[in-house]
Each structure stands twice: as C-alpha cells, then as structure tokens.
Amino acid sequence: TMKRLPNVCDYLDLPMQHISQHILTDMNRTDTSAHIRKVCRMFKERGMMLRTTLMVGFPGETDEDFEELMDFVAETKFDRMGAFMFCPEDGTRAAEMPNQVPEEVKQERYDRLMTLQHGISLAQNKARVGTTCRVLVEKKRGSRYVGRSEYEAPETDGSIFFGSDEPCEIGSFVNVKITGAKAYDLMGERI
C-alpha cells in the first residue's frame, strides 16, 4: 500500500536494536527475531529503502549473539544503518544486569559492525550511479549544491553533492543524475 502512495517515501526506519532473540528478550522488546526478519525481507522485496539503528554490547551479549547480528546485517543489506555501544544508565534495569560486556569488546564489535555496513553502503550507493533522482536543494557549498532525495533522511544519512549550470533555489526540487558514490554520500549533476 505504501509503495502506491505518491506522497509517501519508499524509505523506512526500523530501529530494531538487535536480532538475537536472547538479547531482544533481555531488552524487553516485544518483537521476535523471526518477525523482524520477515518484515525486513518483505520491505526489501518491495524495493523499499531500509534504515535501522543497532546496539552492540548489551549485557549478556555473547560472541554468538554478535555474530548473529553481523550475519543478519550482511544478509539484509540495510541501505542506511547507525549503531551505538550500550552505555549503562544509573537506575535502569540494564545497568544492574549481570554479564556486562567490557568496553574494549563493545568497541571491537562496534568497529566490526560499522566496517561491514561501510562496505554494504558503498555497494548500495555505487548501484545508484547512472540513475536519476529528484533532489531537495538544501544549501550551496562553494560551487556545488547539497541536497537529498527521498532516500536520505535529514541529519542522519549522507547527502547528494551536485553541480548545476543554472542557479538552484534553496528549498526547490531538481533532477540530478548520480555520477559518483562514496560510502555515505553521492555526487551528481543537475539535468
């Protein structure tokens, strides 16, 4: 249904935090690992761009839990992904849980997860080279403009940097052909 609505972007942010059922249960998340996988597959099959936010180092996260998370990210190939390391908050149940993950282990897991996503994001962005998209012009930086399409959320995702032979009005939409890709940003030319 969403795909057919012209005023709805083909972009979903599903902040799932983890995929291990053990960790989801310990987090008091009501969703199941199986349901999360099903939802992600369904939206990817429909051509939706998916973003998520994941956490590493929640108390009790084992090497197996983390590897399950890595495998899930590798198979799902999120278009956009953020991650953070668990940080205990005074007075919360999680801060008092046993099996706190050491900081150096959290950092190593975070680095591995973000390295994996960097490669996925670069491949996803390279696949957009040669395509044309509608871009909201947000600002001018030097001789180039900066904007985003329906697939880049403000403040969390990368930007599209593009040149134009004609001045572009900030706040307007222009068509841009994507000519280059980095892991998180795209380059292009107005057409």
Which role does the model predict for each range below?
Residues 1-80, 88-105:
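Conserved non-cysteine loop/helix-boundary elements of the Radical SAM core domain that shape
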Residues 85, 96-191:
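Terminal RNA-binding accessory module
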